[in-house]
From Swiss-Prot:
Belongs to the MdcC family. It is found in: Cytoplasm. The gene is mdcC. It comes from Stutzerimonas stutzeri (strain A1501). One of its GO terms (molecular function) is acyl carrier activity. This is Malonate decarboxylase acyl carrier protein. The modification O-(phosphoribosyl dephospho-coenzyme A)serine is found at residue 25. It holds the Pfam family ACP. Covalently binds the prosthetic group of malonate decarboxylase.
Length: 99
């Protein structure tokens, strides 16, 4: 198991919380909670050692296209593909944007 941390610029804190995915379903669980204004903090606990660059590139692609709300994101990964990771993150971002 490896724990990775990432930070990105963000907007204002999100309005809500979200939990998407289940570790046993698609091998990924993502918890999103409001964070500190201007900061997106992501912590990834993964069973895949040596994948930090893959995670960094995925997040950079996602957040280059849009400015995310300020969030603390915890990801529990057991070998999910980048497509599943992006899908779950997009689902979570959609969820925290609703009242």
């Amino acid at each position: 198991m490896e724990t990775l941390s990432f930070e990105f610029a963000a907007g204002q804190p999100a309005r809500g919380k979200a939990l998407v995915g289940v570790v046993g379903s698609g091998d990924l669980e993502v918890l999103l909670e409001p964070g500190q204004a201007g900061k997106l903090a992501i912590q990834v606990v993964t069973s895949v050692n040596g994948a930090e660059q893959r995670w960094q590139q995925l997040f950079e692609r996602m957040f280059r296209e849009q400015t995310p709300p300020a969030l603390n994101i915890d990801i529990h990964d057991f070998g999910a593909t980048p497509g599943v990771v992006r899908l779950r993150l997009e689902q979570g971002l959609e969820e925290v944007g609703h009242d």
